[in-house]
Amino acid sequence: YADQIDKAIRRAESAGSALASNLPIGGTAVGTGINTHPEFGAKVAQRLTEALGISFAEADNHFEAQATRDCVVEASGFLRTVAVSFTKIANDLRWMGSGPRGGLFEIALPAVQPGSSIMPGKVNPVICESAMMVACRVQGNDLAIALGGTGGVGSLLELNVAMPMMADALLDSIGLLSATADMLVDRCLMGLEPNVPVIAVSYTHLTLPTKQAV
């Protein structure tokens, strides 16, 4: 899980690089740059870099950068992969925390709300399930962004008219994933405890056939 998160962090950083290195400014309407100072885009990128501490670069081809938003589609793809990683981890935690009587119950999830009155001891895995719902939303945003970059929907000849929708969906995904990462750590992982007696029994049962074979 830790390595999966490390790779997710690198993917998120790659998403930012994909956007910052292809700034479509200075190309005016369709990428010609007509009636604009030839250094306008580069100077804006430099000022943004100085102000935000992020390395920005003017697009090397304004026709491509303004007719398509492939870098946004690429960045969203990285975020979609992060969302899939969140789903895997959250779902595993949900199953390992199921119980106490009818599930695995290998870990004790922290209770963040009242449990069920008809199932004593059961902790509802609401934090895990919240993370999974966010992941579904991010994957939906990714589809919307992909459609926005598709010819006939957003990309029309020299222009892409779906940039507002693509930007809104991308920012939504970034905010959701960021908040969900904090929520998983603070409300789930920090209070998670291994159920040692149950794990010991499971380990004994799993290794019994091996011992018998020996």
Task: Give the location of each predicted region.
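Long, amphipathic alpha-helical stalk/connector segments used for oligomerization, subunit docking
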Residues: 137-200
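Conserved small/polar residues in nucleotide/adenosyl-binding loops
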Residues: 204-210
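Short alpha-helical "patches" and their helix-cap loops
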Residues: 94-99, 103, 108, 146-152, ...
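Hydrophobic packing and interface segments
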Residues: 41, 45, 198-199, 206
